């Protein structure tokens, strides 16, 4: 479906203020319960994962870092055989994902050859490009799913089922499956599934329903290699997106449904939240690649979206979201310094931004929402509507409950020079 000519995308050239791709381990190791994620990286990678994911070593999580030391610089390839054997003894995984990071990529480590060398028939080792030089933290999920594609069975022609593409927790997955079955849509499974040996069969008559907005590459690959159809719709966030998503998906199976009443009831359920959002100026900086559907929900909830920026926009994959953002300033790969000037000039009521930039904004008196929270919470479909709305209004309510900022009180005894 062509993008509306009214939706203008401004392309800039700045770096992404985001976590690197290794952060995807945080939710994927919990989703794929018989997996292990091994990162070949430095002490920086190890500190990042332990602190960002809040895991202690004695908890024996199903991820780890094989540290590159100075001695490794003189070797042709890192020696990981002993590490792999230890992982197998301690965790007995069905699959091991070998993730790249910045330093070994600069060293030109042959990850594909290394993964092939370490693989066995019983426990394949799959290379996942996840370096922060190329990917932000949500895009690396796309890399993990692409690594799984060769292990998805071939579905025969004529077997028309939907496969939901994107990692969600088991409760959300059950909700999506139940909703589809109630609408008469046959479900083939999820990519990824909770176990490596339960990957869905995908073939020429499979309908791929992406439920995360950062998975364009794996959907394109399955369309190209398996001939699968890819649903082009809004993503199932908010009453508006959920209604359109299910109606469009049903239509691909020849089922006509009208979910207007259900969407209206969902809007009514979150009326206290949307009343608070109406008229509020909200600015979304680039971070998670979820910005387009989040901005669309805010717009339909009555907020004024000052700017919606994202690290990467695929005009085909995001076509429906872009059409729904008619009249909104949409920026790809935004220049953060330019954004700072616009934020100072427009003084938005709330900024949805990364953890890196959140505290400086707060220090300058702005209300901030961490964009990363939207990747970790259950905000999909009808069951996620209330959670999604609450995520946006919680910082507004928190600011209302706080006393007025009194600089002298905050600085008393801390900065004598300021007295």
Swiss-Prot record:
Q: Is NAD found in the keyword set? A: no
The protein's annotated catalytic reaction(s) are: chlorophyllide a + oxidized 2[4Fe-4S]-[ferredoxin] + 2 ADP + 2 phosphate = protochlorophyllide a + reduced 2[4Fe-4S]-[ferredoxin] + 2 ATP + 2 H2O
Q: Which InterPro entries match?
A: LIPOR_BchN/ChlN (IPR050293), Nase/OxRdtase_comp1 (IPR000510), Protochl_reductN (IPR005970)
Q: Which cofactor does it need?
A: [4Fe-4S] cluster
MF GO annotations: 4 iron, 4 sulfur cluster binding; ATP binding; metal ion binding; oxidoreductase activity, acting on iron-sulfur proteins as donors; oxidoreductase activity, acting on the CH-CH group of donors, iron-sulfur protein as acceptor
Q: What is its EC number?
A: 1.3.7.7
| Self-association state and partner proteins as the record states | Protochlorophyllide reductase is composed of three subunits; BchL, BchN and BchB. Forms a heterotetramer of two BchB and two BchN subunits.
Q: Could you identify this protein by its name?
A: Light-independent protochlorophyllide reductase subunit N
- Source taxonomy lineage? Bacteria, Pseudomonadati, Chlorobiota, Chlorobiia, Chlorobiales
